[in-house]
Structure formats: structure tokens, C-alpha cells
């Protein structure tokens, strides 16, 4: 027998007042331009949006609660499924939080490999953004070209960890593997080729009349709005605020490499597009410097700390103590000291951070993920008001959200 629910549907609590001159429509959750299971309730006056309400939760999986029932190492593959376009960024942010909790310092080579993975992942994320954003506006050629280059980078990532999207490539205390043979040569070959591809994209879009009409003065975000709504990443830098966590609070070896922080002052969709295009070039600059840093590092890729990190495979197979220590870590999990940490990082979409409260056991007492797409999606409530229905899809694509990290 079905028990009647006392809870009213979510949409019944939304204060939309139907008037003769206005119309309420649903954009999504099954819509090709929603970039996931996002539902937007829009109130229109003609074709102009007068009220907007994003409705999320269609892909909610309870990841933060899942973390409370897993040992610390078990949760790493789950982070892949948050922003599944930038899995390495999620892996790193989580591992960095646990390492800070345990007081671990990773080897220099592991830090370089992490930076390589993060910047390659940033490029693949930005390429997917440009491809889908251009497709939303009708630029089919750019969509195909971006996927062509993205395949090359995905092949590089796959050569390292065996996966194209859900990498699980990092470990608490370091990384899973050293770089394969000839990896740096292939990466540098891409770094030499990709600037020409970027120029092709810009030749197709920069002065394209339709592209500029659909992006200039569309989706304008002021400095005050960006700060008030918690915007980060390109959403913040496109409004004139030159803030990048890799510069402001350097982690890994970002303080040892030279790179710029692209920004624009107009705050519209076109300004954010120009920031993204420049970020490609800065990532290439970082990758070239990482190739130089890698050559000056010793071969260790995991921290040496038996309480939290397993020994090398060779030691596990030849030394009784290392085997026992590995068995305990895998079956019982590591036990960080009691305390709280929050570690912010600069993911391709903005500030991605993990808060962990440890009670001294092998499982986190509380884990909270601060994901950029969640805040940017909430901003639609104000950002879309006053725009036209035809521009809603263009703005959604430009903001660059992914529902995996919104719903979690």
C-alpha cells in the first residue's frame, strides 16, 4: 500500500504568480542544452526572463555521506565522479586535505607529476567547455576541432593511469606511478602543436559576427555580483578580479613556475571566453616548466610514513614489516589525528576545496566539498533575469557548470 507523503512538491513552494502577460516554462531536466540534469523554471514576459529558479538534485548521490562510511583511501575513486570532466582536480583536492590532516609532505617528483596531471586535465576541461559552448551557439566546426585536440590529451592521461575520464591517479602521500618512458617528449610535442590549434579557434570565433552578437554584453557579471554570489575561477577573473589560488595560496610547486593570471574587465560572456583562451596558453607554459623540473627530481613518488602510506611494491614483496604495514593500511585504513582542515585549490571551474573533520578514526566524521559549479548555478537566479530566452542557453554554456559536482 502506498503511504501518502505529507511533503509538498518542491515547485509548489516557489512564489511564481501567473499573470495573463507572463508564461512559465521548464528548461530541462531533459534538455540537450542543460549540460546535465538541470531544471530551470523560467517566468517569461514575452521572450524576456523576469524570474528564474534553478532546481537541482536529479543526480544527487550523497557523496559526502558516503565518505563518512569509507576509509580515507576508499573515497578517492568517488571524487572522480564529482566533476567528471576534471577528475584529477578532485583527486588532488581531496588527497591534499587528508595530507594536511596527517602532516604529510609529498616527494618533489610526485608534486611535479601532480602538476602535469592537473594542467593536462585543465586543458581537457577547457576544450570540452569551448566545444559545447560553441555548439550551443551553432559553431559546429569548433566543436569538432576541440574534440580532435582533446583526444590527444586524453591519450596522454590514459598512457599514465589507464583511464580517460575517471583517473583515480593520485594517492594519499603521492601518486600511483612514475611517468612512462617518452611521456615528456609526447607532452612537449603537444605543447608545441597546440598553440597553432588555439589560433585556428580564435580565427573562427574572435571576429565572427554571430559569435560576438551572442556573447558580447550577454550574461554580464559585475565585480559586486561575482563576490556576493561566491563566484570563483573564470567567473571571477572575467569580471576584473585577478584572483587565482595557485598564485594567492600556492600549493605543490606552483610558486616555482612562472605563469600569468588572465583576466578581463567587461564581465560578459565574450570576456570570459577570452580569459579561457589565454588560460590554455598559461597551462602550456606550466607544462613546459614541469618537464624541466621533473628531470631534476629523485625517483620517489610516495611519502615515507609507515603510519599513513604503504611502502613500495618491492618492499612489500620482500620485507615482512612492510607487508604487515600494507595489510593494516588496506584493511583498517589510516587514522589521522583529531582535527579539522580545509584545503582550497584552483580547479578548471573555480575554487574546489575539501573540509574534513577527523575524530581520530579511520573514517572522516564529516566531509564537505566546496565545489564551484554549485555557487555558479545558484547565481542563475539573478544572472538570467532580464535576459532573453534565446540567450539563456548561451549563458548556461558560458558559465561552465557540471551537474556531477553540483548534486554530489
Curated annotation (Swiss-Prot):
Organism: Campylobacter jejuni subsp. jejuni serotype O:23/36 (strain 81-176)
Alphabetical keyword list: Cell inner membrane, Cell membrane, Membrane, NAD, Quinone, Translocase, Transport, Ubiquinone
Lineage: Bacteria, Pseudomonadati, Campylobacterota, Epsilonproteobacteria, Campylobacterales
Cited HAMAP family: NDH1_NuoD
Record-linked Gene3D superfamilies: Cytochrome-c3 Hydrogenase, chain B (1.10.645.10)
Membrane topology of this protein: Peripheral membrane protein
The protein's assembly and partners: NDH-1 is composed of 14 different subunits. Subunits NuoB, C, D, E, F, and G constitute the peripheral sector of the complex.
UniProt record similarity statement: Belongs to the complex I 49 kDa subunit family.
Protein name: NADH-quinone oxidoreductase subunit D
Keyword Protein transport: no
GO CC term (a single one): plasma membrane
Main location: membrane
PANTHER family, sorted: NADH DEHYDROGENASE [UBIQUINONE] IRON-SULFUR PROTEIN 2, MITOCHONDRIAL, NADH-UBIQUINONE OXIDOREDUCTASE 49 KDA SUBUNIT
Amino acid at each position: 500500500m502506498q503511504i501518502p507523503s505529507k511533503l509538498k512538491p518542491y515547485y509548489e513552494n516557489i512564489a511564481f504568480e501567473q499573470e495573463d502577460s507572463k508564461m512559465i516554462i521548464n528548461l530541462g531536466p531533459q534538455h540537450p542544452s542543460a549540460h546535465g540534469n538541470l531544471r530551470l523554471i523560467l517566468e517569461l514576459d514575452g521572450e524576456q526572463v523576469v524570474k528564474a529558479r534553478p532546481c537541482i538534485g536529479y543526480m544527487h548521490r550523497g557523496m559526502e555521506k558516503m565518505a563518512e562510511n569509507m576509509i580515507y583511501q576508499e573515497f578517492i575513486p568517488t571524487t572522480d565522479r564529482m566533476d567528471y570532466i576534471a577528475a584529477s582536480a578532485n583527486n588532488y583536492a581531496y588527497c591534499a586535505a587528508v595530507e594536511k590532516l596527517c602532516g604529510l609532505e609529498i616527494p618533489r617528483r610526485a608534486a611535479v607529476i601532480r602538476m602535469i596531471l592537473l594542467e593536462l586535465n585543465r586543458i581537457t576541461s577547457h576544450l570540452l567547455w569551448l566545444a559545447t559552448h560553441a555548439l550551443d551557439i551553432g559553431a559546429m566546426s569548433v566543436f569538432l576541432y576541440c574534440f580532435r585536440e582533446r583526444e590527444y590529451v586524453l591519450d596522454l592521461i590514459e598512457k599514465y593511469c589507464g583511464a580517460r575520464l575517471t583517473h583515480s591517479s593520485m594517492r594519499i602521500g603521492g601518486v600511483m606511478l612514475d611517468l612512462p618512458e617518452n611521456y615528456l617528449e609526447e607532452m612537449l610535442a603537444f605543447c608545441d602543436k597546440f598553440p597553432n590549434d588555439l589560433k585556428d579557434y580564435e580565427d573562427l570565433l574572435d571576429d565572427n559576427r554571430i559569435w560576438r552578437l551572442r556573447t558580447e554584453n550577454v550574461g554580464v557579471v559585475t565585480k559586486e555580483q561575482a563576490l556576493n554570489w561566491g563566484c570563483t575561477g573564470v567567473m571571477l577573473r572575467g569580471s576584473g578580479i585577478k584572483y587565482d589560488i595557485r598564485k594567492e595560496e600556492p600549493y605543490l610547486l606552483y610558486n616555482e613556475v612562472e605563469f600569468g593570471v588572465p583576466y578581463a574587465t567587461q564581465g560578459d560572456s565574450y570576456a570570459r571566453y577570452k580569459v579561457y583562451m589565454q588560460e590554455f596558453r598559461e597551462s602550456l607554459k606550466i607544462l613546459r616548466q614541469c618537464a624541466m623540473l621533473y628531470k631534476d627530481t629523485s625517483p620517489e613518488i610516495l611519502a615515507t610514513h609507515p603510519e599513513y602510506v604503504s611502502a613500495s611494491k618491492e618492499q612489500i614483496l620482500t620485507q615482512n614489516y612492510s607487508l604487515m604495514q600494507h595489510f593494516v593500511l588496506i584493511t583498517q585504513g589510516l587514522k589521522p589525528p583529531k582535527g579539522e582542515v580545509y584545503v582550497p585549490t584552483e580547479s578548471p571551474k573555480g575554487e574546489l576545496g575539501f573540509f574534513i573533520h577527523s575524530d581520530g578514526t579511520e573514517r572522516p566524521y564529516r566531509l564537505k566539498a566546496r565545489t564551484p559549479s554549485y555557487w555558479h548555478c545558484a547565481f542563475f537566479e539573478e544572472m538570467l533575469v532580464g535576459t532573453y530566452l534565446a540567450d539563456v542557453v548561451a549563458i548556461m554554456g558560458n558559465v561552465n557548470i557540471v551537474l556531477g559536482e553540483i548534486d554530489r
